[in-house]
Amino acid sequence: QRYREFLIRCSRNYDHVFYVAGNHEHYGYDIARSELAIRAFVPENVHFLNNNDYIIGDYVVLGTTLWTDLKNNDPLVKWDVERYMNDFRVIRNNDRRFTPDRWWEEHFRSFQWLDKKLDEYNDKKVIVMTHHAPSIRSIHERYLHSRSFNTNYGYFSELDEYVEAHPQIKYWFHGHVHNSNDYMIGTTRVISNPHGYPDTDDQNPEFKFDLNLNLD
């Protein structure tokens, strides 16, 4: 209900709203059915992108959750993320447990789609929107030296070289981490501006409510 109310407010304030689902949308639900439930309640001018593209002006927007690659499907990483991350306790998968293997399948499917679309739009200006981050540079330094470092691979995929090889990507917007980012990978500007969990102390002190970007 809170998601629906938030999206309705956004739809009233903007002509176009682009929405990519994260991991929390699936909490308490079945990932195999969540997309249909979301599409059923989003307003008409809210573009829910789950491996979908949308052309607006001179830009093509490519949207996907892009679950991480778990360090190229590394068994030790899969063991650690399953042990420490809530996703595997509160998300269902066709009435069974959500597992690291299913997570990786979601990543593979999304990455294959993204790769195909970037080939298709190699002569266009592209905005990529994902929930998970495309680089370790988006991870706050306080997590880089933790004993559970491998759990960071549940937040990003190492796509720096891939992004540099696709200069048509002018912007890459992402969420998931609870810290702000604004940096360059080659000619691509990577930005995150998360609010953090509502009604908790886990919020981003650098969140900019009035962040505006003038696209070239």
Put a short name on every predicted segment.
Residues 1, 18-23, 47-51, 127-130, ...:
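Active-site neighborhood of phospho(di)ester-bond hydrolases with catalytic His/Asp-centered motifs
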Residues 1-57, 120, 142-165:
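Core catalytic region of metal-dependent phosphoesterases/phosphodiesterases
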Residues 1-2, 24-31, 53-55, 68-72, ...:
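Active-site environment of divalent metal-dependent phosphoester hydrolases
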Residues 13, 41-44, 48, 74-75, ...:
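A broadly tuned preference for mixed-charge, low-complexity surface segments
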Residues 15, 41-42, 62-71, 98, ...:
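Short secondary-structure transition/capping segments
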Residues 53-63, 125, 184-189:
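Beta-strand-turn-beta hairpins that frame and shape the catalytic cleft
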Residues 62-127, 132-150:
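Active-site-proximal loop/helix segment associated with metal-binding centers of metalloenzymes
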Residues 140, 146, 150-170, 177-216:
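Binuclear metal-dependent phosphoesterase catalytic core
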